[in-house]
Amino acid sequence: TPHTGWGALERQPGQWDWQELDAQMAYLDSVKMGYGGILIGSPEWNTADPPGHLPVNHLKGWSHYVTEVVKHCQGRIRRWEIWNEPPNFTGKNQTPADYAEIVVAAYDAAKDVDSGCLIGLAAKSAHLNYLEQVIQAGAKDHFDYITLHPYEILSTVADNVGTEPMFMNIVPSVRKMLAAQNPAKANVPVVFTELGHDLGKGPEVQAQALVKAYTMGAAQGVACIQWFEGRDGDSGPMGLLDNKGQPRPAFTAMREMIRHLGQQPVYLGWIPLGGIHRGFVFEGQAGPVLVAWAQNAGSCEFKPGASVQSVDPLTGKSSNGPAFTLTGAPLLFTNLPRPLITDAKANRNRPMQWWGADYSSATSVSLTTGENQKLDGLRSLSGDALAKSVVAYGGSARAGGVPGGNVFVVDPAFLSYTREPLEITVVCRRNEANDNAGFKLIYESTTGIKTAGHWFTIPDNKTWHTATFRLEDPQFVNYWGYNLSLESDGNTYNRYYLKSVEVRKVKDRR
């Protein structure tokens, strides 16, 4: 993205410097790369607003900046995102209403200059609660598309803990929110103007995350995904290329995805692959292409009914055969038999039921931990690597000592965006040493991440104890990649065993 910030362009009142911006746009044009712009920032000479704040006290200057930059870039930049990841990079005490104020001013100024330009309403991560509040505060009808940066949700997918349903629910949740708050904009494009994964768990995991992100993004209707980043330099390392310009497996994966699916993949539908595993079928460059992997660190046998070609997107190497073993590493399949394509098209609008059942009509979801773990519409993201199953007091349980707390997600079909009172029941027990232990419940609410009303101290280790939390204002949108968390404020009070957790819808309102 070329540098279109206010402070870089108008260093002194009325003195505009376009040289660097023009050079950047000329380079991007020369390599035939599409680009947009960001309306952001406040120059040092604007003393009406503190540094790092939305310029709400100098809206006249902000509107003039928008007018000048949109006019200067007309015909080259059509899409303008307003700010970067709000409420990030705004004042500590600034509100959704403040952001709404600069959105309205920017929208009006930009449209006056270029009626064909498009204005993007932005939020960090997948913070739909914030977007909802911005629309309610005055931004209604003053945007043409939505931009999100759902790094955290992709990170859980990359960890292969079975959170594909959360990622696949981003656009549907946006649609729900818009239908409720701004029906005229319910179907505007959703763009991931940043999305990426670092090399913390290796270059292969990064590349696999890229394939899954673009596959599920295209399948749910994301209009465009901009991978962060092309080459190491800003943060990370997260680039397709390292800081010396050498390609990583993610570069090869991107190349193979484009080679087989094209620049604008056309989603045909999905197929079941046995149990909880799913595959996505697209109309590719030379015929239909299936992208498939096994979720939740599992594996499954894929028998397409005919000999097909398999392509490893991380290497570009291919093989042919009638059967394949799928793992968490995605594969591309071509030369698909017609019945498979027909089935995929028939499934396109059907619920995917990733977790083996349809929870849309369920009144509760739960999990029981331990050796005979039972997952019924509720999952922990803590993972076996962090909290191994243990046998305690003659029954199965899970250690509570998880760094960052025990983190949970519900099946989106059970509850997503819709506000409904919940009762959370946690069955737990102190450890054998009877160490003092307890936790608080953190959850996604209508105002963001929130702590439930009280701290629960586990009484003793003599029996299993039940902690109950009543939530009046939950709003699950996975903007940090989870819905619920049991947090013990460090590693002092987390020495307990967790037997079960239940999330139940409560019909009576207090």
Regions found by a protein language model. Name each.
Residues 1-154:
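Substrate-binding cleft and catalytic face of glycoside hydrolase catalytic domains
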Residues 96-214, 220:
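Noncatalytic carbohydrate-binding groove/subsite architecture in carbohydrate-active enzymes
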Residues 272-307:
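Carbohydrate-binding surface patches
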Residues 401-475:
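Extracellular ligand-binding interfaces
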